Amino acid sequence: MIGKEVTVQDIILELSEVQPEVLPVDLFCEEELPNEQETEEEPDNERISYKVIAPCGCRNCEVKLRIFVHATEFGIRAFQQLLTGDLQLLCPDCRGNCKHDGS
């Protein structure tokens, strides 16, 4: 290139043969796709042990409760949603001080 601006005459293209290791992959290979029944995910029923640490549900209490559960992945996710939603756990001291309808 001579000068500050590029002109078409300054560009030289060199075409070479494609190397065998960089040939495109044949997308129409003999691979078979699974049918719809095989693609349905089966629920994972494997149970795993978890340690859950949650705060006491009383406003003035700072006790951390430890709960050990054995649950599936779906079960622990459901439990997590309960704990972050309307369900609150109480420590033994706060349970004795609260009025409740159960025994």
Swiss-Prot record:
Belongs to the papillomaviridae E7 protein family. The lineage of its organism: Viruses, Monodnaviria, Shotokuvirae, Cossaviricota, Papovaviricetes. Residues 1-48 are annotated as: E7 terminal domain. Homodimer. Homooligomer. Interacts with host RB1; this interaction induces dissociation of RB1-E2F1 complex thereby disrupting RB1 activity. Interacts with host EP300; this interaction represses EP300 transcriptional activity. Interacts with protein E2; this interaction inhibits E7 oncogenic activity. Interacts with host TMEM173/STING; this interaction impairs the ability of TMEM173/STING to sense cytosolic DNA and promote the production of type I interferon (IFN-alpha and IFN-beta). InterPro entries: Papilloma_E7. SUPFAM superfamilies: E7 C-terminal domain-like. One of its GO terms (cellular component) is host cell nucleus. This is Protein E7. The gene is E7. A motif (Nuclear export signal) lies at residues 76-84. Plays a role in viral genome replication by driving entry of quiescent cells into the cell cycle. Stimulation of progression from G1 to S phase allows the virus to efficiently use the cellular DNA replicating machinery to achieve viral genome replication. E7 protein has both transforming and trans-activating activities. Induces the disassembly of the E2F1 transcription factor from RB1, with subsequent transcriptional activation of E2F1-regulated S-phase genes. Interferes with host histone deacetylation mediated by HDAC1 and HDAC2, leading to transcription activation. Keywords: Activator, DNA-binding, Early protein, G1/S host cell cycle checkpoint dysregulation by virus, Host cytoplasm, Host nucleus, Host-virus interaction, Inhibition of host innate immune response by virus, Inhibition of host interferon signaling pathway by virus, Interferon antiviral system evasion, Metal-binding, Modulation of host cell cycle by virus, Oncogene, Transcription, Transcription regulation, Viral immunoevasion, Zinc, Zinc-finger. It comes from Human papillomavirus 5. The keyword Transit peptide does not apply. The E7 terminal domain is an intrinsically disordered domain, whose flexibility and conformational transitions confer target adaptability to the oncoprotein. It allows adaptation to a variety of protein targets and exposes the PEST degradation sequence that regulates its turnover in the cell. GO terms for molecular function: DNA binding; DNA-binding transcription factor activity; protein domain specific binding; zinc ion binding. It is found in: Host cytoplasm; Host nucleus. GO terms for biological process: DNA-templated transcription; symbiont-mediated perturbation of host cell cycle G1/S transition checkpoint; symbiont-mediated suppression of host innate immune response; symbiont-mediated suppression of host type I interferon-mediated signaling pathway. A motif (LXCXE motif) lies at residues 27-31. A zinc finger (unnamed) spans 56-94. The keyword Metal-binding applies.
